Structures are given as C-alpha cells and as structure tokens.
Amino acid sequence: MTDAGTVNGENENKQEGMIFEILKKTAESGAAARLGRLRLPRRTPIDTPNYIATSSRGVIPHITPDNLAKHARFGAAYLALEDFIEKKNPAVLSIPSPDKRPLHTFTCLPESIATVLATRRNPAIKTPVGNGAKFVAIFTSTGFANITTEEYASTVEKLRPDIAIGPADLFHTSSMPPSKKLVRMAERTEEWTDVFLSPKRQQAFREAGVSVFAPVLAVPYQIQWEHLSHLANDVVDSISGLAVYNVDLIPDIEDNYAPLVPLPRLSLHIPDTPLAILRQISLGVDVCSVPFLNTVSDSGVALTFTFPPKAGSGIQPLGTDMWLPEHETAVAPLMEGCGCYACTTHHRAFVHHLLNAKEMLGWTLLQIHNHQVVSDFFAGVRATLRDGGGDGFEALSEEFAKTYEPELPLGTGTRPRARGYHFKGEANPSRINPPAWERFSGDEADAASDAGAVARRADAEGTETPVLPDVGSLKLQEKGFAEVAADEAKPAQ
C-alpha cells in the first residue's frame, strides 16, 4: 500500500489552480485503484474515486439549478461545446460574468460544481462525415457543423471552464476502423494537442485558470504509443490530467510513462453498469462519467444498488421500475435507507402517480434519487479503499457481481418526449415520439392512410409532424370539420 507521501511527491499540478494528490494506492506498481483528492479554485474538493454528472444542452436533465444547489452531491458536470454554438454569434460568448467565468454564469451551475468542457457530448451523436485534418465535426441544435482546433482553443479561453479536454479524433461510425485510420487518428490528435497547447495558449489558459486534460484515444497501445510518449516527454508540463477514452490503456501508461502516472484520470469510457464502474476503478480511474444515469431516470427506474452490497436472498435487481402497478399504493421510499430528498419526503405511490400523469416532478425526483444512489456508491468505494485496501475492494466487487443482476432494468412506461439530443444521427431512424396531430378524415381508413403519409414525410424531412393541415378550409368543411353531431348537440335552454 502506498501513501500520499511517496506518490504525491511530484504530483502537484504544474498549472496554477488545480492540485491533485494521491492519498493511497492499492499496489506499489502497475494499474490499481487509488484514493485521492482533486482541488480546484473556488470549488468543493472532489474526493476520488468519484463521478461527474453528464449534462445535456448545458443542464443536468430534469434538475433546475436551485435544486442542484440543494440536493446535488457530485462535484463536477460534463459540458459539450457543441451544445452552445448553434449560430454565428452564440449567446454563451457574450454573456456578462461577474466572476469572470462565463460558462459557469451561462449554465447557472452552483458555485461548488466544477465545469468540464469538451468539444462533443459523451456519448456523441454520429455526424454524416468524419473529422477533417484541421477540424472536428460536431452536432449543434441547428444541424451539423465543423470547429477547428484554433476556434475551440479560443472559445475555451473565453468561456474559462475549470477543466478543458483537449480535442481528439474519435471514432466516427465503426468502433474497429482499419489500422490506417487508427494511425491517422493518433497523428491528428497529437497535432491538435500541439496546436491547442501552443505557448501563447498555455499562458492564456494559465491566466484564465483553465486546467487542460489531454486525450488518450480508444485505439490500441501499439498505434498511439508515440502520442503517449509525446505527452509524457514534451507536453506533461502543460497538462493537468488525462481524459481516457479506453481504460484498458491505463496499465500501459503505468508501466511505460512514469511522468503521466501522478496525473488525475478522467474516464470518458462509457460504463454500461455499476459493475463496469468498479472495473474502471480497479484499473486506476479517478473520476468516471456515468451517462446511464440520465437514461435510467428517463425510463422511470429508481436505482437500488449499494456498495458494499447489502446481504439478501437471491440475486437482486439494480433498480425498480416505478411504472409497475404494484407501486400504486406503496408508501415505502424508493430505496430503504436512502437519505435523498425523494426518499425522505415522498413515497413510491406518489412517484408512480406522477409518472402516469406525465408530471415533470416525477422525473425530477427520480433524477435526484439516482444521483444520490451513485454518490453513495462511490462513497462506499472510497471507504472500502481507505479501510480495507485493494484486497477488500476486490472481494466486495466480486460480492457485488454475485448480489446484483448484470444489467440495469428497462422501464415499461413512456419516457419524456424525446428531444434532439436523444437522436443518434443514424440513417433512416425510426420515430421516437408518436405523432401529436393527424389529418382529419371522415373515413377511418383514409384517416389512417393520411396520418401514415404525414408521419413518413416528417421522417424524411427530419421534422416534427406539422400542426397545420395540408388541405384548405373548403376541403375540411366538406369533410365535416368542426361540426357537432346532431345527437351530441347542446340542448336548447
């Protein structure tokens, strides 16, 4: 077991503002879980291992800033630049900021929560074309666009996030592209890193209080070893951490690049389940991104897992589907022993009613609860690493795998109305939302045919079903539009 005195000797960050210290490591050498603390100016220190919340369009879905300040237990939020630059002069670049942190002011995040800015969402929506030699393809709220490394660096300098993730040439359509493409991805990322961290930019970032995390691509080590060597030998003095897109590369970093070992590791390798999070922690990840939280809340599922796992008979589910009829009269909390606002103030029957009534509060309570469950999960991991060390953590991880089902439950009800960021950018996608309007027709067969035609046309155009009918008023009048049937007419007074 290694303590902070031996690991953190050269670990204080070279850039002003951010400090990361390793308090304990579960193995003397090689990839292993580690206990640490990340400090950012004017933000609440983040004890690691921990997680960052995933935002959408600059907000944590379903939770308003005032409720974040009251109930949030996470220390940072992941933001995507493509969410804010939908037009030539975006509002985010012109907003006055009293504390000289425009991104924080624009998103109205609580003062305690740090901002982590990257070019693309995580996970990102596929673009029609891949990245170019000097630009990253992005998906804004008004369509697809390109942003160059210089433009991204200039925007970071203006927005002043607490942490900025360097530009990376990520997978476009295939997760296993040809080796020539992988080599080009590594070379581009190295070139973009040099442009992003030019001497002039380094000074500007330092004065703005921006800490830069360099990307580690999700390509084999044999292909990007030169990029990693460049980071370790030439760029390490200019970066504050690593943004890892494939945690399986961490053992190679530990074994071959000592200058990169003390840096904090932010995992952008998307975990599908809590068990995948435990594996990332065991490899040495300090901060995880957990996008499935938003998906689970949207589906109407309340998470119920803990770490260490609770003793029980049989395999337990990772969550509870709050749409099920069995919750109609249940006055129990969403999870026994949970101290979140939803569990201490309301009960299952109330949340079940809200979901069925399509009340926004239902998803808000689920989101607050689910973030609390994940916060408690990471707190349990830290306590285990602190008290039980690596052996205790591995033993409880195996027990967790035996106690809970391998997959998260799927909600059986209707999710909130899908927005643009829910779409994946795939060819010929099926409609997520049912059509809200249909063309009027006296004949049921004609009505069904007309409605289908409208929906197909909307699919082709990529728009919502039109509110206005496509026929004139005379045609509608011939079909009896707005007429009251004789037997339903209002009786004479």
Residue ranges, per PLM feature:
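Non-catalytic, usually N-terminal nucleic-acid engagement modules in DNA/RNA processing proteins
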Residues: T2-F205, T320, P325, F481, ...
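Conserved, mostly hydrophobic/aromatic
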Residues: T44, V156, A214, Q280, ...
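Alpha-helix boundary recognition
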Residues: A69, E157, A232, I281-S282, ...
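Short acidic/polar active-site loop segments enriched in Thr and Asp
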Residues: G75, D162, D237-S240, D286, ...
